[in-house]
Every structure is written in C-alpha cells, then in structure tokens.
Regions:
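Short glycine/threonine-rich loop/turn motifs
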Residues: 179, 206-328
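Extended, charged alpha/beta regions that create polyanion-binding interfaces
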Residues: 59-167
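Conserved small/polar residues in nucleotide/adenosyl-binding loops
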Residues: 331-332
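Glycine-rich phosphate/diphosphate-binding loop of Rossmann-like nucleotide-binding domains
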Residues: 159-213
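Flexible, glycine/charged-enriched surface loops at secondary-structure junctions
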Residues: 55-56, 81-86, 144-146, 204-208, ...
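Residue-level recognition of short, solvent-exposed, well-ordered loop/turn junctions
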Residues: 32, 38, 123, 127-130, ...
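Solvent-exposed alpha-helices and their adjacent loops that cap or buttress functional pockets
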Residues: 7-11, 29, 83-86, 126-128, ...
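Short, low-complexity N-terminal leaders and the immediately following helix N-cap/first helix
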Residues: 1-88
C-alpha cells in the first residue's frame, strides 16, 4: 500500500472504499476497492476530501481490510447464519433461523485484545429472530500483517466463535399449586402469563394440574404430566420459605436433579431449576414472574427452548447484572 497525491493517481488501483457522506441523503461508497482511478474521478475524489489516496503496491506481506474481514467472518460464522457482502471493510453476520445465540466469550476477548481487529456481537444466551444481526467484523487499519491474522485464526482452534442453536418443539405441562387457587378463593392469573411467554416459541401445553399445598399430590401431578409426554414442566406457586409452600420439596421428590434452588436475580430469587432423567426440565417459578416485566424466567426460557443445559455455575454468575431494573441487558 502506498500513499499518493490524488492528482497523480490516475491509472492506479484504489486499495479501500471511498465513502461519501451527505447528511440526511447518503452514506455510501462512491468508489470501491479495486477501482482504477481515471482522470474524471479526480474532481469527485477531491470533493469528498481525498487530497491523497492509498493505492496498491504488489509484493506486500499484508492483507487488505476486506480480506481480513473475511478471515474474521470465517472465524465467527457458525451454522444457521450468513454474511452480508463486505462493505467498507466490514462484514456482518445475520441469523437464518429463530434460535439461541451462543458466544465464546473467552475467544472473542482474546481476538479483540490482539489489537488492529475487532469482533462485535450481541450478548450470548439471548433469543434471536431470523434476520437479526448477530455480529460485525473488521480490522481497524486499511491493511494488516498476514501473520497477525494467522495468529487470530489460531485462537479459534477449529471452532467458530458464534453458534446458533435452533429452538425445538416442547410439550409443556403446567402444575399450579396453592390452596387459594385450588379452593377457588382467587382466580389463577399465573397461567395466562406463562402461556403468553410460551407463545413466543414452538410449544404446546399438553396439560395443567391444579393442586393444593400437599407436596405428595404435587409430585404425583408432575410425574403424571411427564408420563403423558411433557418434556418441560413448569410449576407455579409455593416457591417461598413459608410453611405452606411445598413446591421445592415436591420437585425434589420426583427424583429430579436439582441444579439450583435460588438464583442471584431480582426479581426471581426463589427460582428453582432441575432436570428429570437428565433432560426434562422441571422449573419452579416464583410469584414475580406473574407481574414483573423481566425476571429470571425470561433469561432461562430461551436456553431451555434450545435444549441448552444451564449449570449452577452459570446461574451463580448472574449476580453481577442480576438486578433487572426492567431492562433486558443481563444474560446467562
């Protein structure tokens, strides 16, 4: 790459896009990388502030920004996503399906710490829709050493930085607990909220059982729904430490493995996550899910719907950022 006065660059090959910005009208390239500069181009280049331009010199051990962006794109792109055409040195990745975005945080941090290159992505472990932008890649200068890009590629170790897990169909069973609902003292306002959240995914509710505060009956209800084919059971009510609240004990008595009873998220501290036979989630939902805009359930549900198992360590990491404040920035 060589810097040359624009008036002297006729016949030379541009090594980067030349962008024209007119506020409220356009922001686009007037000349693309690889364009051979003509006499007629000189006034246009000068009008966009280019008194000097970078032109290609052969024999360099360097990569142009577009070529480097392709390498970064290849490092990031997993299944079910596609790239946009390279433009002004940048490539973006777009989702081909609805699913759960996974990001290798360690690898993206290592690449971004190398300097002269960047990968910007959405938060991992969030639901995305088909057509959503997932990430963008580019280098900072116009050219970069080939050797440096090879070092960046080595960070990936044959695995892409991004992956997109498709949501799967779930047959859902709902167990509603509490004497107040069972004996018709109050209306069940929890189940409509649950069904509304499930409507964002490929789900069918195959049954609902209403139980009083009898832990043996709750356990029996959970197991009966699993026998009917439920591959996700949601239990509402009875999740606090009050003496009449028996849902955590009932879930434990199914034989399910308890991942965690309690999560460092507000609202949602009394959340319970367990897996029956290692693969069927049984979830105890605290009352806040019924009225709060964002809770722990909104963070866990996308992962459950993609069969992405959640660990106790991942739940513990929610403490930083776990104060929801009705925002959607916290993530697992």
């Amino acid at each position: 790459m060589k810097l040359m006065k624009t008036q002297d660059a006729v016949g030379q090959v541009l090594c980067h896009d030349i962008t024209q910005i007119i506020k409220g009208v356009t922001k686009d390239a007037v000349f693309r990388k690889g364009h051979v500069i003509t006499e007629e181009d000189i006034p246009v280049l000068l009008s966009v502030g280019k008194d000097n331009v970078y032109i290609w010199e052969k024999g360099e051990k360097k990569l142009h920004e577009n070529e480097a962006a392709e390498i970064l794109r290849e490092m990031c792109q997993g299944e079910y996503m596609h790239p946009t055409p390279v433009k002004e040195g940048k490539i973006e990745l777009v989702a081909d399906i609805d699913g759960l975005l996974k990001v290798n945080s360690d690898k993206i941090k290592k690449v971004n710490s190398m300097g002269e290159m960047m990968i910007a992505s959405r938060h991992g472990n969030f639901a995305v829709k088909k057509g959503d932008k997932l990430a963008g890649t580019r280098i900072i200068p116009l050219v970069i050493e080939k050797e440096k890009m090879e070092s960046a590629k080595a960070v990936c170790e044959g695995q892409t930085i991004l992956s997109l897990k498709p949501f799967v169909h779930k047959k859902v069973g709902i167990v509603t607990t509490g004497n107040e609902v069972y004996y018709h003292r109050i209306e069940d306002t929890f189940t409509p909220v649950i069904k509304e959240k499930l409507a964002d995914y490929d789900t069918e509710v195959i049954g609902q059982v209403v139980c009083n505060d009898d832990h043996e009956k709750i356990t029996k209800a959970i197991l009966s729904l699993i026998e009917k084919g439920a591959d996700l059971v949601l239990c509402t009510g009875g999740m606090s430490v009050d003496p009449d609240d028996k849902t955590p004990l009932a879930i434990k008595n199914t034989g399910a493995k308890i991942v965690s009873y309690g999560a460092p998220v507000l609202p949602g501290a009394m959340f319970l996550l367990s897996y029956y036979n290692e693969d069927i989630p049984i979830v105890g939902l605290p009352g806040c899910v019924m009225y709060a805009k964002r809770t722990i359930f909104d963070l866990a549900l996308p992962r459950i719907m993609a069969d992405d198992k959640i660990t106790a360590e991942e739940l513990a990491e929610l403490g930083e950022g776990g104060l929801c404040l009705n925002l959607s920035l916290i993530h697992i």
